[in-house]
Regions:
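Membrane-interfacial helix-loop segments of redox and metal-homeostasis proteins
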Residues: 2-155
């Protein structure tokens, strides 16, 4: 019979990693989603600055619904329900928004000549103006965590 003292962490490394990934993503998405949901006008302005769609009604719907999708997915990750599905949606959002952040930063770099990592703008993530390189690294780490959850064997 194995002693609890011999194994202070009852979870194995894989399940502990999954637990940490769920909680990091869950907390981030609940916090940032609520921040956007409470300030939909600021989020709408930030999304409009990307210039990827001109239809105000469509952008208004995005600003109204996307934050709640983030909160919902974050909550699912925190409680451990539909983890792979929630992680897949989070993965898709991160890839899409990282792509448009990169595209906007490259446009700013080309038109102004500002060093790429010195570019700062409100990406719409709920934190105000951020340095683009820092945001892209942060998104890459969150994307890796979400992909790990999507590809995990445990359901």
């Amino acid at each position: 019979m194995k002693s609890v003292l011999a194994h202070p962490f009852p979870m194995n490394c894989r399940s502990m990693t999954g637990w940490v990934a769920r909680w990091v993503l869950g907390i981030c998405f609940v916090y940032l989603g609520l921040n956007k949901a409470w300030n939909p006008t600021d989020f709408l302005k930030a999304v409009h600055q990307y210039g990827w769609v001109d239809q105000t009604l469509f952008l208004t719907w995005i600003a109204a619904l996307l934050p709640w999708l983030e909160v919902f997915c974050g909550f699912l990750l925190l409680v451990g329900f539909w983890v792979r599905g929630a992680a897949f949606v989070v993965f898709g959002m991160l890839v899409f928004f990282s792509g448009i952040i990169l595209h906007r930063a490259l446009r700013i770099h080309e038109t102004t000549g500002i060093d790429f990592c010195e570019i700062r703008f409100d990406c719409g993530c709920g934190n105000g103006a951020v340095l683009v390189c820092r945001k892209l690294v942060e998104n890459a780490l969150l994307t890796a965590l979400s992909l790990a959850l999507v590809l995990s064997r445990k359901r």
